[in-house]
A protein has these predicted regions:
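Conserved S-adenosyl-L-methionine
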Residues: 126, 147-157
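Histidine-anchored nucleotide/phosphate-binding helix
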Residues: 138-150
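Ferredoxin-reductase
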Residues: 2-106
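A short, basic/flexible loop-to-alpha-helix module at the beginning of a structural domain
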Residues: 114-125
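Reductase modules of NAD(P)H-dependent flavoproteins
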Residues: 2-4, 160-254
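Phosphate- and divalent-cation-binding pockets in alpha/beta enzyme and binding domains
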Residues: 120, 140-143, 231-232
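Short, conserved phosphate/pyrophosphate- and ester-handling motifs at nucleotide-, phospho-/glycolipid
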Residues: 53, 137, 225
Length: 254
């Protein structure tokens, strides 16, 4: 983990879904840094070296005693986008972090530490890989999926993504392109409160458990709502899945 305070400047912001924005930052400081895991060679100037799934901790203000308020955000962009990083945030009314980000303008700087975190892909997988996300928990999952699809591994790569309504959807073109390029990848998007007709209705937990008997040596990566993670994790363990060897998770709180 890099504990050194670094800076980046906002270069783009776009609305991707209802109350959900993508923020793109250019790394400002030219010093090389090392990721939280050993990853080989040093970074070159203005690069942020990280593994898909890791996060950064951002100073979003100060409390009443003048102490910094820190919030953690997963990196949504792949490492190949050298010199920049993107974050996908659901803006929550009254949230300290949301208020900070909503006030950012092009060229504004943020201070952060990282990258850090252990919610990353295993170095290899013998069987199927199942990613389960809710809401903006998809942010670190997408680059993780891209990483494993570049490997010559035998198993299927499956994504189950749960959202509330159609207005919460984003990234459909990217997911469709991944499906078209990689026959072993399949994406299933479920809406729990669709406003109109939608084929895949309900929460993601049930469909994942229904699929479990057909999976071969699966590894599960769970990211998003903490309640979903705990419920699904408990159900998987009850069905013989190893918590230590087969389940990785990262809780998000919108």
């Amino acid at each position: 983990m890099s504990s050194r305070i670094q800076q980046a400047r906002l270069v783009a912001r776009r609305r991707v879904a209802e109350k959900t924005d993508e923020f793109v930052f250019a790394i400002s400081n030219p010093q090389a840094n090392q990721p939280s895991h050993s990853m080989g060679t040093s970074a070159s100037a203005c690069e942020l070296r990280f593994r898909p799934g890791q996060f950064i901790s951002i100073n979003v203000g100060t409390d009443g005693d003048g102490n910094p308020i820190l919030r953690s955000y997963s990196i949504a962009s792949p490492p190949e986008r050298r010199g920049e990083l993107s974050l996908i945030l659901r803006l929550v009314e009254g949230g300290v972090g949301s208020r900070f980000f909503d006030g950012l303008r092009s060229g504004d700087a943020i201070s952060f530490t990282g990258p850090m975190g252990f919610f990353v892909n295993e170095l290899s997988h013998a069987g199927d890989i199942v990613y389960v996300a809710t809401g903006t928990g998809i942010a670190p999952i997408l680059p993780m999926i891209e990483e494993v699809l570049r490997r010559n591994e035998p198993g299927r790569v499956l994504l189950f993504w749960g959202l509330r309504r159609e207005a919460d959807l984003f990234g459909q073109d990217e997911l469709a392109a991944l499906s078209a390029r990689h026959p072993r990848f399949a994406c299933h998007v479920y809406l729990s409160q669709p406003q109109g007709f939608y084929r895949l209705r309900g929460r993601v937990i049930g469909p994942v458990l229904e699929l479990l008997p057909s999976l071969r040596e699966p590894t599960f990566y769970l990211c998003g709502n903490g309640q979903m993670i705990e419920e699904l994790k408990a159900a998987l363990i009850d069905r013989g899945v190893s918590r230590k060897r087969q389940i990785r998770s990262e809780a998000f709180f919108d």
